[in-house]
Amino acid sequence: MKTTLFLTLALFAIALASHGQQPPLAGGFSQAAITDAEVLKAAQFAVKAHDAKLTLQYVTAAEQQVVAGINFKLKLTTSDARKADVIVWRKLDGSFELTSWQSIAADPAILTTEYIYDTGPYPQIHATTIVETPTGLVTAWFGGTAEKNPDVCIWVSRQLPDGQWSEGVETANGVQPDGSRHPTWNPVLFQPKDAPLMLFYKVGPSPSTWWGELKTSADGGKTWSAAQKLPQGIFGPIKNKPVQLANGDILCPTSNETDTKPSAWAIYFERTADLGKTWTRTELLHDGFKIGAIQPSILFLGGDKLQAVGRTKQTKVFQITSEDAGKTWGEISLTDLPNPNSGTDAVTLADGRHLLIYNHTAKGRSPLNLAISKDGKTWEASLVFEDEPKKEFSYPAIIQTKDGLVHITYTWKRAKVKHVVVDPAKLTTKPLMN
């Protein structure tokens, strides 16, 4: 009896020492680090045991209890955007058993979450874009060993009739006629009315030295034209989608980054009335220092009034308005919405509401949030797609398709492209918390 008691106490002491046990909580549980290797093993086991098709996104809370091994009580989020409270028993032999799984329903506005691919032929991806074509959805991103490396190419995937996504296809690269090679950047897909699909992207060593190129597809992204270099001083949409105005003009939101120190970041707009054959552009709309702004998105405020919002160096989302369909623009200003110097995107819905997808933080690229506005001035919080400390969920793209649903893609930890479908009719709001 004494021997049994001694062994039990010894095991208890070893477990406490090895797992950094904190003061006991109710039920004999103690707090555990969500980054602890055994906690993560238990969480991954729980997800696969519950549904082999799911993957663990992150653990948000962890407790542990030493009872003939260790019980881990975990709060976690899975790849279908659902949360769960689980208990996993790690036995004395080191194996795991899932003893409890309690799903917490995802927000009813989130209809689908998925990855465009499981694994790709590149270590990193970034800068997604998505568009609806007459034959279905098409998405693109850049991928390679790392951003800025010469092997970074533009990849395209199409949603097939069965809802699955085609394998990503290398569609553009930075190989030059003399054999040299530059990285590609920031693809932007756009479907003009009654015209071929357009793929804009940048080629060059850096944002201050790159140039714009354009490819088109007459079959919904299956095949593509040769690359066309845009005219000197024209870059196409720098990150976010263009809009087609009532007169048929395509208005591209763009920006410039100088190679000075500090770099001046300034926005402007380009316009084509003939599908990219000829172009005009505004001048830079501000000095790029007091407010350093890039990567605008365009919203429709009614009539010829437009608004652009986007990324800054000043930890706030910028805004600027036009009263004449983008020919001239007012003064740029900062909103109350935080921005960690990371890309955003926005769209005006068919019902007139505006959606902004962005990182609601002044630092880091998590969480990833959706905000709603009726007038482009007052914003309310709606959804949180991702919220994992010290991870990256960034550079989103957002569109509304003809069926009224909202489609979103974004960089998931620089490893995958994530696609989320939202029903805007089911969105609820609450005050923003800064």
What is each model feature region?
Residues L7-A15:
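Bacterial N-terminal signal peptides
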